[in-house]
Curated annotation (Swiss-Prot):
Modified residues (Pyruvic acid (Ser)): S190
EC number: 4.1.1.65
Protein name: Phosphatidylserine decarboxylase proenzyme
Family: Belongs to the phosphatidylserine decarboxylase family. PSD-A subfamily.
A molecular-function term among this protein's GO annotations: phosphatidylserine decarboxylase activity
Length: 232
């Protein structure tokens, strides 16, 4: 293993969307330290926390079109049958929804749950309730993606939270996606909902921790053995 690869395995990169925030915190630390030296160390700690928040680690993603991978780091806050948001145009029949809540200490880079092609992106303005509340799915600001997969269309909804006030989407309509590919980011606490068509069986339970790009949250068909994975 090369020295460069060794360093990469130890130091987790910061996503480019976090650069302005990390730089801002560091400059503020210098200014505060000039006024009162102990404040520099407080500012430096906040700078390191900001870099930690915007971390963008590589993940090992299973390459199986029958598996759905977690789109976010966080706690599974809901596994239930509900009607998908109207703006996704997924119909009015209940679909399996798996919800993942991200607190301010979780990695907030969002990933595609499955391989497919984006057929729709719909943004909706809304409130900024605690994203862990069930009603946040209906009332909060959100950005929804519809992905055409081998098993039909799935919906992936980025939901803003009490602190989060900015949803970022990195992809466009008609763009192909691999499972685990980065699709967006939500700043400072939020939630991801994934809607599955008939045939999907949940593979997680409420309260379970999920890792974006790695944890299997749903599966189509019968459970299988080990699968091939790739870095994402």
């Amino acid at each position: 293993m090369s020295l460069l690869n060794s360093v990469r395995n130890v130091i987790v990169p910061v996503h480019k969307e976090g650069y302005p925030f990390v730089a801002g915190f560091f400059v503020a630390s210098l200014v505060l330290g000039w006024v009162f030296k102990p404040l520099f160390w407080i500012g430096l700690i906040l700078t390191l926390w900001c870099a930690y928040f915007f971390r963008d680690p590589e993940r090992m993603t299973a390459q199986d079109d029958d598996l759905a991978i977690s789109p976010a780091d966080g706690k599974v806050s809901g596994v239930q049958m509900v009607t998908p948001p109207a703006e996704l145009n997924l119909g009015t029949e209940p679909m399996l929804r798996v919800s993942i809540f991200m607190n301010v200490f979780d990695c907030h880079v969002n990933r595609s749950p499955m391989r497919g092609r984006i057929t729709n992106i719909a943004y909706r303005q809304g409130s900024f309730l605690n994203a862990e509340l069930d009603k946040a799915s209906e009332q909060n600001e959100r950005n929804g993606l519809v992905i055409e997969t081998k098993h039909g269309e799935i919906g992936v909804v980025q939901i803003a939270g009490l602190v989060a006030r900015r949803i970022l989407c990195f992809v466009n309509v008609n763009e192909p996606l691999d499972a685990g590919e980065r699709i967006g980011l939500i700043r400072f606490g939020s939630r991801l909902d994934v809607f599955f068509p008939a045939g999907a069986e949940p593979r997680v339970a409420v309260g379970q921790r999920a890792i974006a790009g790695e944890t299997i949250i749903a599966e189509f068909g019968s459970p299988k053995g080990p699968t091939v994975s790739r870095r994402s």
